[in-house]
Amino acid sequence: MAAIQGIEGVISQLQATAMAARGQDTHSQSTVSFAGQLHAALDRISDRQAAARVQAEKFTLGEPGIALNDVMADMQKASVSMQMGIQVRNKLVAAYQEVMSMQV
């Protein structure tokens, strides 16, 4: 769900840029920087991994109330969010390389 919010932020940024290029008023939409959205997404990925790691440690130590299925689900969520982050990075690098290879 957090990944979708990050993507929605990027989409709203692109829409605001497109509206500005057409000369339309963009004050009705909130302005969110791309770097800010990217940083927030990376923070969420890091937080999710840290929470999964802590829960795994608690399970290993035998704390009551920590079930194996919860630990495994949190570890999978952290893994999926990390893979999503890697894919976003790969797409950004590919887009950057494409822009840099354009002739002026």
Curated annotation (Swiss-Prot):
It comes from the Bacteria. The keyword ATP-binding does not apply. InterPro entries: FliE. The lineage of its organism: Bacteria, Pseudomonadati, Pseudomonadota, Gammaproteobacteria, Enterobacterales. One of its GO terms (biological process) is bacterial-type flagellum assembly. The keyword Repressor does not apply. It comes from Salmonella typhimurium (strain LT2 / SGSC1412 / ATCC 700720). GO terms for molecular function: cytoskeletal motor activity; structural molecule activity. Keywords: Bacterial flagellum. Pfam families: FliE. It is found in: Bacterial flagellum basal body. This is Flagellar hook-basal body complex protein FliE. One of its GO terms (cellular component) is bacterial-type flagellum basal body. Belongs to the FliE family.
